[in-house]
A protein has these predicted regions:
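Short loop/helix-cap segments at secondary-structure boundaries that form the rim of catalytic
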Residues: 18-22, 38-41, 80-89
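His-Asp phosphorelay/catalytic-motif detector in bacterial-type signaling
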Residues: 43, 67-75
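Conserved hydrophobic helix-helix packing surfaces used for dimerization/oligomerization
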Residues: 3-5
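Output/docking surface of receiver
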Residues: 31, 75-117
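Acidic, metal-coordinating helix/loop segments flanking the phosphotransfer/catalytic sites
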Residues: 29-46
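Conserved phosphotransfer microenvironments
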Residues: 49-69, 79
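Conserved N-terminal glycine/acidic-rich loop preference
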Residues: 11-14, 43-52, 83-93
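Two-component/phosphorelay signaling modules centered on CheY-like receiver
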Residues: 9-30
């Protein structure tokens, strides 16, 4: 079964581009305003926070994800000068071409390996 990934962002073009880049997985895209509801509706294997989500909103969404799942897998896309969102998130730099796809594969593969132990 394909992993379920929620991509949260406030730029529709970036959301479509990222969904296409990650088409090997089952993707849902949503803006940050509607992300809380999307998180409540179903569990996701990975939540991706775009750099278009303001840091305060990203922190709120991370807190909400923690309420719903004690071990959420969250990937934050950040430009090199952004502050970290905390140790609960994986981070990928926009300056690395193909970095998003490889980071997602690495995170999801790690979870499969960990659950098989």
């Amino acid at each position: 079964m394909k992993a379920l990934i929620l991509i949260i962002g406030d730029d529709p073009i970036l959301l479509r581009t990222r969904a296409e880049l990650l088409r090997d997985w089952q993707i849902t895209t949503v803006n940050s305003r509607d992300a809380g509801e999307a998180l409540r509706l179903r569990p996701y294997d990975l939540v991706i926070l775009s750099q278009t989500v303001q840091e305060t909103q990203a922190r709120r969404l991370i807190a909400q994800a923690l309420e719903l799942d004690p071990n959420p897998r969250i990937l934050a896309i950040r430009s090199g000068d952004d502050r970290q969102l905390g140790s609960l998130t994986y981070q990928v730099d926009l300056n690395n071409p193909g970095g998003l796809r490889s980071a997602v594969a690495r995170i999801l593969d790690h979870e499969v390996i960990a659950s098989a132990r």
